[in-house]
């Protein structure tokens, strides 16, 4: 499937699903974020944001997904879905095709940036006899499921580099790993912020498999060159040169003066924005390691920040926290008399 056809299918899906978004207006508005697979970085970032919201007495449902394309679709059409994590190359190619294709232009209308996040490394786990990216020619390569950012990135990279595998298989990374280990695949792509749980929590034999270096001038001109530090994974003792793509938190341009669904969603977006700004140090300390690499000023070109996000970042904005303050323990009568006497003598 070509990139244009993939984006057109996305656009048609948005049009077909418009009634679903409208249905959310008649329900109690909840908050949710579209993330990724159970072993990916996106879902851990989503859980960190939910923890942040819970400190304010609110909740953010963390929804598993195929990845970037499904997440973009979810923000546009899924009821009670205010956020989705999306790869910046997905956004870039949507912008490219939007100028020539009205359906794609309609698909991206109303979608906004909430926050830029971090660089995601393109992991390609391969047999050790496959030494370079060019060696994927004629091999059996899994590129992720169709609605994932991994699928789009892998497809673009192979096309840009002129690499033609013997087979490109739409298999999720979590399913591809055992197939690689069984000899049914030669390599598979996985775009995820390191350290990715898939590699850190599974036994991978370094004598059979390695992360493929990606040193290709064409790809390095399109993507960000990156170095995966040695020891990031147990099977990977040495640094690996590869490329990366930025992850971005997307939202929708909810109207704060619109219907009740838009008003409530805008409040939720503003609340999370305010909490993220004031809690970024806590996220960097207690959340996924990728929070330490987040640059909140690195906005992808061609996209605007949501009005509701900017409202939440206003120093005067107060998030709608509903969690009651902890109750002060009540003194017994004897302790109360003691405190009064101490305060009278020493001052309190």
Language model region names:
Residues 88, 164-265:
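Pocket-lining segment of extracytoplasmic ligand-binding domains
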Residues 28, 40, 57, 67-70, ...:
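Extracytoplasmic
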Residues 242-348:
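Segments of small-molecule ligand-sensing domains
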Residues 20-26:
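Sec/Tat signal peptide C-region and signal peptidase I cleavage site
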Residues 1-12:
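Bacterial N-terminal signal peptides that target proteins for export
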Residues 28-54, 60, 120-182:
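Bilobed "Venus flytrap"/periplasmic-binding protein-like clamshell domains
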Residues 103-117, 233-240:
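A structural signal for short loop-to-beta-strand junctions that line the ligand-binding cleft
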Residues 46, 62-104, 176-179, 195-203:
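Pocket-flanking alpha-helical
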């Amino acid at each position: 499937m070509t990139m244009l056809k993939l984006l057109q299918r996305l656009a048609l899906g948005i049009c077909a699903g418009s009634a679903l978004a409208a249905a959310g207006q008649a329900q109690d508005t909840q908050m949710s974020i579209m993330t990724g697979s159970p072993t990916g970085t996106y879902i851990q970032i989503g859980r960190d944001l939910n923890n942040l919201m819970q400190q304010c007495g609110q909740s953010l449902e963390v929804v598993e997904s195929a990845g970037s394309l499904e997440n973009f679709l979810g923000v546009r059409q899924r009821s009670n879905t205010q956020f989705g994590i999306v790869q910046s190359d997905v956004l870039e190619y949507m912008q490219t095709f939007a100028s020539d294709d009205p359906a794609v232009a309609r698909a991206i209308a109303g979608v906004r940036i909430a926050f830029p996040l971090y660089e995601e490394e393109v992991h390609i786990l391969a047999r050790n006899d496959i030494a370079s990216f060019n060696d994927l020619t004629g091999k059996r390569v899994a590129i992720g499921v169709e609605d994932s950012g991994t699928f789009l990135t892998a497809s673009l990279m192979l096309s840009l580099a002129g690499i033609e595998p013997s087979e490109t298989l739409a298999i999720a990374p979590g399913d591809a790993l055992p197939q690689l280990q069984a000899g049914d695949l030669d390599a598979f792509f996985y775009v995820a912020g390191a350290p990715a749980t898939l590699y850190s929590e599974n036994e991978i034999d370094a004598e059979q498999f390695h992360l493929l270096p990606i040193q290709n001038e064409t790809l390095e001109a399109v993507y960000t060159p990156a170095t995966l530090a040695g020891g990031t994974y147990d099977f990977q003792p040495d640094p690996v040169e590869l490329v990366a793509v930025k992850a971005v938190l997307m939202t929708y341009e909810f109207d704060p003066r619109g219907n009740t669904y838009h008003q409530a969603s805008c409040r939720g977006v503003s609340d999370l924005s305010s909490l993220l700004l004031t809690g970024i140090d806590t996220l960097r300390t207690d959340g996924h390691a990728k929070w330490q690499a987040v640059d909140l000023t690195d906005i992808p070109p061609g996209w605007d920040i949501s009005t509701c996000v900017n409202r939440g970042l206003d120093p005067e904005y107060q998030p709608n926290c509903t969690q009651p303050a902890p109750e002060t323990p009540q003194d017994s009568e004897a302790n109360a008399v003691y405190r009064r006497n101490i305060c009278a003598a020493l001052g309190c």
